[in-house]
Amino acid sequence: MVTVEDVRKAQRAEGPATVMAIGTATPPNCVDQSTYPDFYFRITNSEHKAELKEKFQRMCDKSMIKKRYMYLTEEILKENPSVCEYMAPSLDARQDMVVVEVPKLGKEAATKAIKEWGQPKSKITHLVFCTTSGVDMPGADYQLTKLLGLRPSVKRLMMYQQGCFAGGTVLRLAKDLAENNKGARVLVVCSEITAVTFRGPSDTHLDSLVGQALFGDGAAAIIVGADPVPEVEKPLFELVSAAQTILPDSDGAIDGHLREVGLTFHLLKDVPGLISKNIEKALTEAFQPLGISDWNSIFWIAHPGGPAILDQVELKLSLKPEKLRATRHVLSEYGNMSSACVLFILDEMRRKSAEEGLKTTGEGLEWGVLFGFGPGLTVETVVLHSLCT
């Protein structure tokens, strides 16, 4: 007689979840950060606000961002003047864009990841889709299933409105799905488009202006599975552990509200300070079981909320400047793409490691950390184990 224990054992994978492939995509429209303030104040009919424009120029100059990609072009914005005003009812116009474009951009990234993985898409058993750009029913997960031609029986999980920490969340969920379902191959997609948050400037809402200086569009996709098929699947990283926590005394530190005017964004406290103050505790809890306490001995993938967060984390932990190289590179080339950022950084790290002939995907090191920071203030901590390049 078969027992429940026997059934459970047969259902579970043997080894840890691994990242098997990564793909990324951006809209074609590239925006130069140095000239963006001119464009932004012109398109929003705000050129008379000279002092505010100077302030925004300084924000952009200090952002450490060279360029960003945006679905919103001058033509689209001219056709949708309500999106350009500071607080005009505009949710319908925004939704009409993102409901179509979020799955479309996700498809581009997913197609690249599936190609690298090298297996037929019929072998994808689960889909995790994450976006903070708009909501709809059936969701972006359903639309992507149709766009890619995945099996109708693919098990879908749709994550809306999570914000910037969710690149860590999707890895945590994909790990559990892959390890608890033998043979599972999880397609994870994060797709973010700033059409929901774009709006004109206001003297009284400077945190909105911070978002206008930092956010960019992008989608990233990964394939996660345990027990890779030898000679067929080439794992890049192992997902060793994953944790989520709400930081103490951080209520209202980062808020987003979906309203008639779109998604409004609020930074109410010292976010870089809160993160740097609590980051060592998260690291210690994650790495104590491995006997690791030297934060320069591991590789780093941190959500680049903005340069101030990275600077304070670096200072607090006495990190060598090269530790956040991949993170800063992605911030500089793409801006803050919310949940997709950490997956872009993962991609950048494994590519650069291979290019430089380093022995592992994690800059030649064995162990690493991936951090997501976002509304709550919520922190996701994922421990990674790199593999041979």
From Swiss-Prot:
Matching Pfam families: Chal_sti_synt_C, Chal_sti_synt_N
PROSITE patterns: CHALCONE_SYNTH
GO function terms (MF aspect): identical protein binding; naringenin-chalcone synthase activity; protein homodimerization activity
Known tissue expression: Mainly expressed in flowers, to a lower extent in young leaves, and barely in mature leaves and twigs.
InterPro entries: Chalcone/stilbene_synt_C, Chalcone/stilbene_synt_N, Chalcone/stilbene_synthase_AS, Polyketide_synthase_type-III, Thiolase-like
Pathway: Secondary metabolite biosynthesis; flavonoid biosynthesis
Residues at the catalytic site: C164, H303, N336
Protein name, entry field: Chalcone synthase
Organism: Rhododendron dauricum
The encoding gene: CHS
